[in-house]
Amino acid sequence: MRGHKPTLKEYVLDLYPEPTDLYCYEQLSDSSDEDEGLDRPDGQAQPATADYYIVTCCHTCNTTVRLCVNSTASDLRTIQQLLMGTVNIVCPTCAQQ
C-alpha cells in the first residue's frame, strides 16, 4: 500500500490500544499464616504427606485388617519394609486375647 487511502475496505485504521488493568485483586494472607508450615529449626517446610490405606491380614486369625496412615512417601516405604519383615499386625479381637 503506497497511498494515503487504503484500497481494500478490510483494513481498519482507527483502532486504538485498550488499557489493561494491571491491579492484582488477590487478597494477601497474614504473614503469620505463612510461618505455620515452617516447623523445623532451620526454617525448611515440612515434607508433603498423604493418606495411605494399608490392607493386610491378622497374624493370628488371618482376617483382613485395614490401616489408614498419614505419612510421607519415604516413611511409607519404611512401614512397608517393617510389615514385610518381623512386624506383624493383629486385629482388635486378637489383640484383646
From Swiss-Prot:
Pfam families: E7 (PF00527). Coiled coil: none annotated. One of its GO terms (biological process) is symbiont-mediated suppression of host innate immune response. It is found in: Host cytoplasm; Host nucleus. The keyword Ribosomal protein does not apply. Highly phosphorylated. Keywords: Activator, DNA-binding, Early protein, G1/S host cell cycle checkpoint dysregulation by virus, Host cytoplasm, Host nucleus, Host-virus interaction, Inhibition of host innate immune response by virus, Inhibition of host interferon signaling pathway by virus, Interferon antiviral system evasion, Metal-binding, Modulation of host cell cycle by virus, Oncogene, Transcription, Transcription regulation, Viral immunoevasion, Zinc, Zinc-finger. A motif (LXCXE motif) lies at residues 22-26. The keyword Zinc-finger applies. Its main location: host cell. Residues 1-40 are annotated as: E7 terminal domain. A zinc finger (unnamed) spans 58-94. InterPro entries: Papilloma_E7. Belongs to the papillomaviridae E7 protein family. Homodimer. Homooligomer. Interacts with host RB1; this interaction induces dissociation of RB1-E2F1 complex thereby disrupting RB1 activity. Interacts with host EP300; this interaction represses EP300 transcriptional activity. Interacts with protein E2; this interaction inhibits E7 oncogenic activity. Interacts with host TMEM173/STING; this interaction impairs the ability of TMEM173/STING to sense cytosolic DNA and promote the production of type I interferon (IFN-alpha and IFN-beta). This is Protein E7. The lineage of its organism: Viruses, Monodnaviria, Shotokuvirae, Cossaviricota, Papovaviricetes.
